[in-house]
Amino acid sequence: MMKHPYRIIMRTVLCATVAWSMCSCDDGHVDDPVFENTEDSYNVEITGKFQSLNTWRGTYSVAAACFNDESNYSLIQKVLPSSTEDTVQVLKLSNVPTNAKTVEIAVTNTLRKRIATLYSYPIPYNQRYSDTIKIDVGTLNVGMFGSINQFIFQGTGTNCARCHSAERPTANLDLTAAHAYNSLVNAPAEKDPSKLRVKPGDAEGSFLYKVISEGDENVGYSHVGLFTDDTYAPFLDIIKAWIDGGAKE
Ligand code: HEC
């Protein structure tokens, strides 16, 4: 007597399912194709609006750059093109070495050494080499004052805004992000009213520069030590160049 064909099909399906599930449970050796290396470099595409780029003076530049953990010198970088403020820029970095750990918008010196990070994107550990890394940074203030404000006045290493804020108005000075510019530029110094804190065009005559570069007898806390560290030392120059260049916002 012939078996019902439906039964045969069902039995086949059942056997196949059991065999497949046993096999896949036991098998720990299957390579995940997502992590397969297909190339030996990344391509990166950064989109964003970069404001106040043209306020930079001196030998520093703002660049899209890639870094690894070991060095402050970029593996590869492209200086942002000086262009009109309200145009969205698309920057491309190709042949980025696969040991790159971050894609950054950073202030760099002429030797491609990182002076300050303004934006950082950590490359995911499972990033596929064959795919372009696409990053949208939105609108970023990359100007000279914007960089000083972000890296020094709000920085966690210098802590200016921790001692100088509306809540803790030491020397009646508010260095929080939204107030730093107006608290400094053309504002008379509390501890030496004969001077402005920042006198545009004249760093040597500005109280801010005196306090951070050599100190002042009327200021009961030495700020010079905040800028001796390698990380912050370049900002003595940058702040001087910013003031001498007209202290633009
Ligand atoms: C640990 C607290 C502390 C930190 C951090 C700090 N300051 Fe001060 N700052 C002071 C004190 C205290 C004074 C002097 C107040 C006094 O003598 O009455 C002062 C005074 C000043 C003055 C003089 C203001 C005036 O009008 O007389 C400036 C400028 C200044 N600080 C800038 C900075 C900057 C820039 C930073 C960060 C790089 C900073 N401070 C970090 C405590 C601090």
Regions found by a protein language model. Give the residues of each.
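Sec-dependent bacterial lipoprotein signal peptides
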Residues: M1-S24
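Aromatic- and Gly/Pro-enriched helix-to-coil junctions and flexible linker segments
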Residues: C25-V44, G48-I76, S82-Q89, V96-E249
